[in-house]
Amino acid sequence: MLRQKITDGEIVLGTMISEIGYPNILRIMKNGGFEFVIIDGEHGPFDLTQFAAMVALGNSIGLDVLIRIPGIDRGMITKLLDMGADGFLVPMVNTVEEAEKLVQYSKYAPMGKRGISTTR
């Protein structure tokens, strides 16, 4: 949904959540007209359980959830995508090689090296 709107040149409204780990904050964002949220997993106090709860709620109410992670971490990327996150942001990607690694971790073969989960 978000990708298509951006591709079509539409303006999308979103925000970053850095402090509030209560999943129902997403309902407030959705009711306020937001189309996506970015959960700050780099500086915020969130753990995988909170990410999973927020992603599940976002999916159920039609709010895209992206997660900012601290760095290039195959395990974290795989878990977030398996949870159903709509995407992720990674700070300090400085080289083509680093960007290519992120793509490989995010996509299934033959375009990438993402493993297959038994639940997704």
Identify the meaning behind each predicted range.
Residues 12-17, 37-39, 65-68, 88-90:
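Hydrophobic faces of well-ordered beta-strands that scaffold small-molecule active sites
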Residues 1-16:
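N-terminal amphipathic alpha-helix/helix-capping segment at the start of soluble metabolic enzymes
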Residues 3-7, 30, 55-59, 103, ...:
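Surface-exposed amphipathic alpha-helices with a cationic face
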Residues 17-32, 71-79:
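Short, acidic/polar
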Residues 75, 87-120:
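Conserved anion-binding
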Residues 32-36, 82-87, 107-108:
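Glycine-enriched alpha-helix->loop->beta-strand junction motifs that scaffold or abut catalytic
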Residues 24-26, 30-53:
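Glycine-rich, proline-tolerant flexible connector loops at the mouths of alpha/beta enzymes
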Residues 48-82, 106-111:
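Alpha-helix-loop-beta-strand connector modules within alpha/beta enzyme cores
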